[in-house]
Amino acid sequence: MSSYSELSNLPIREIPGDYGFPIISAIKDRYDYFYNQGEDAWFHNKAEKYKSTVVKINMAPGPFTSNDYKLVAFLDANSFVCMFDNSLIDKTDTLGGTFKPGKEYYGGYRPVAFIDTKDPNHAALKGYILSSFAKRHNLFIPLFRNTLSDHLFNNLEKQVTEQGKADFNALLPTMTFDFIFRLLCDQKNPSDTVLGAQGPEHLRKWLFPQLIPSLSAKKLPNIIEDMLFHNFLIPFGFIKSDYNKLVDAFSKSAVSMLDEAEKLGIKREEAVQNILFLVGINMFAGLNAFFPHLFRFVGEAGASLHTQLAKEIRSVIKEEGGAITLSAINKMSLVKSVVYETLRLRPPVPLQYGKAKKEFMVQSHDASYKINKGQFVVGYQPMASRDPKIFANPDEFVPDRFMNDGEKMLKHVLWSNGRETESPAPDNKQCPGKDLVHLLGRLILVEFFIRYDTFTLEITPLFRAPNVAFNTLTKASK
């Protein structure tokens, strides 16, 4: 990546924005962010107010969860990509934003996602995770297909038939947890562990205190939710028993992965914490946010797109002799484009945080701005990946956007903490599950349109991922 200091053809501007009155303005911004405007509108309004896509902001949750909430936001494609430059941005303890969960959530360790690339442990831990995925790549397709059949499609059909509606979001946690657990735990059934049938629930309880300060659950009156979840961090003691059961289950079940860690010089205890984080944050939370958006966009596009997807999927599988293989899936260009477009519009993790390692110049499309050493910065991905100076009709779901010549635009798909054209490696912060997430997105569409011709949905907006309910499922015509 080019050094920003080399790009001097743009006028230099002071970073616009106003942090306002101490504490009071930050709390007002928090209410606007979570309740009065919503995340998307809040960031757009800041850019519009200050006529700039590089602005000063009070980042939620703010007081009193964090004392360090005066940030500079990058809201366009040009400025956002500086977040990927390891020479400029320090990612130490910034994954969750302006607050960080205590080390007790990870057994006294810091998982690799919380450490910067300069940390000596980063390359070893990231390399371990990447090699673990590589060794299990032959399981991805057959294991996920079985999980979809056992935990998703049968239940979808049953609920639509018996109740006239099927809650897609409610079915996802069991399906995703079962797949991830079996993948990383030598194909063991999570129900045979101390978790029993409550694995997803234990995982959600462990995740809740780590994620809720930056979210809105929309299940309580605003003032009560804000008082309970955005002013103070929830004590670890409330979920300690859930955490202990998760650690016990993965310690006893992920035997091969833990053996691999020891061979690399990584302590089993530290490896367990990284596995738990990988399962909980990278995969479980990420997939349960991604899949509802995927079906929302495909569902809202209507029967015409459904027909095109079904035709492509079924014809390719027929050409492959009925086999669903990686080679076959890679030939489905429309399916691939639909998944990329979903990740462009609604990245599972919309915010990237870090602190400036040194003073540098960052560029928007029309100006340069000085970022001081130590400045806390944030990039809002849904604005960067919907940049109207990069994409035509940037806010629209265009299913074939990345087909044919459109593939050259993949470098502007940024959901994985890196460009889509780049790959996760031990020396970068790109999501280690990047390729797996994309494969699973394609595979769930393949399995769906093998079974069904079309469907209709009911969408209920939530803070980030929508709630998706299937109203009808039309089985595949012969």
Swiss-Prot record:
Which reactions is this enzyme annotated as catalysing?
(9S)-hydroperoxy-(10E,12Z)-octadecadienoate = colneleate + H2O; (9S)-hydroperoxy-(10E,12Z,15Z)-octadecatrienoate = colnelenate + H2O
InterPro entries named among the record's database cross-references = Cyt_P450, Cyt_P450_E_grp-IV, Cyt_P450_sf
Documented EC number(s): 4.2.1.121
Gene3D superfamilies the record matches? Cytochrome P450
Q: Which family does it belong to?
A: Belongs to the cytochrome P450 family. 9-divinyl ether synthase subfamily.
Q: What organism, scientifically named, is this protein from?
A: Solanum lycopersicum (Tomato)
Let me know which tissues express this protein, per UniProt: Expressed in roots. Detected in stems, but not in flower buds, petioles, cotyledons or leaves.
Function text: Involved in the biosynthesis of the anti-fungal toxins colneleate and colnelenate. Can use (9S)-hydroperoxy-(10E,12Z)-octadecadienoate (9-HPOD) and (9S)-hydroperoxy-(10E,12Z,15Z)-octadecatrienoate (9-HPOT) as substrates, but has a very low activity with the corresponding 13-hydroperoxides (13-HPOD and 13-POT).
Q: Which gene encodes it?
A: DES
What are the protein's UniProt keywords?
Heme, Iron, Lyase, Metal-binding
Residues the record lists as binding heme? C431
Q: Which GO molecular function terms does the record list?
A: colneleate synthase activity; heme binding; iron ion binding; monooxygenase activity; oxidoreductase activity, acting on paired donors, with incorporation or reduction of molecular oxygen
Please report the name of this protein according to its UniProt entry. Answer: Divinyl ether synthase CYP74D1
Name a Pfam family for this protein.
Answer: p450
